Amino acid sequence: YVSDDFNQQMFEAHIAPVFDEKSSAATKKTINYVDLCSCFGNTTMATLHGMGYEEIRDNWSNETRCMTIDKPRRTFNDQSTAVTAIDISPQAMKYGKTVGLYDTTIVCDLNNRTSNEFKLTKDAMSNADIIISTASLVYLELETIEELMEAFVTGGSENGMMLVNFLNPFALEKADATKRILLQKLDFVASRATRHRRMSKLEQDNYPGEEWSLLELWVLQKKKK
């Protein structure tokens, strides 16, 4: 999706500088990065590997090409980055780990909040420094979002930051409810709106006059204590 260029720009403008700041040897550590509802990792390719829209398209040009990620994973002020990916698709998780996009994977139906995998997801969220969740929160129940955000804000780095997307024109009331949850638990940093993808014929019939689905990109940070 063309929107990953804009996710990359938001990441570079508002998240990367926080973790690129000079730190003493005593505080040097691994940056824990969580891709929530990661699918096959396009946004991680954009944010951590610096790949643009055309490069990501080229990555998926054939079954051989997609097995090599050309650009290396970035570091933050020489701190290593550990990537945890969480998604319902075992195929996506296997791919991401095989090609080196992900270090740890959790296959989880996030709306099943009694599963062991959901507990593992909450543990990952509580240890996260950076979380991205792009064009995916709409699929999660509000109770799931509430629990995951609570796990994030009660653990991990004081500088924890998050990049999320809201789809438009779909499920706008749910998007508003999700925003209220996020703003209760996190501080707002920045936002922008972008194109996401062309709408299908059925979608255009359901939303007359619309040709593109849009994304609203938000960056948030943990509230200062």
Which ranges hold each PLM region?
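Class I SAM-dependent methyltransferase Rossmann-like catalytic core
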Residues: 1-28, 50-54
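Conserved class I S-adenosyl-L-methionine
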Residues: 28-40
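Class I SAM-dependent methyltransferase SAM/SAH-binding core
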Residues: 41-114
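A short acidic, Gly/Pro-enriched loop at the edge of an enzyme's catalytic core
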Residues: 117-130
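A short SAM/SAH-binding and catalytic strip from SAM-dependent methyltransferases
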Residues: 128-143
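A short glycine-rich, Lys/Arg-flanked "PGG" loop and its adjoining helix->strand segment in the class I
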Residues: 143-159
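Conserved beta-strand signature within the Rossmann-like core of class I S-adenosyl-L-methionine
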Residues: 156-170
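Class I S-adenosyl-L-methionine
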Residues: 188-225
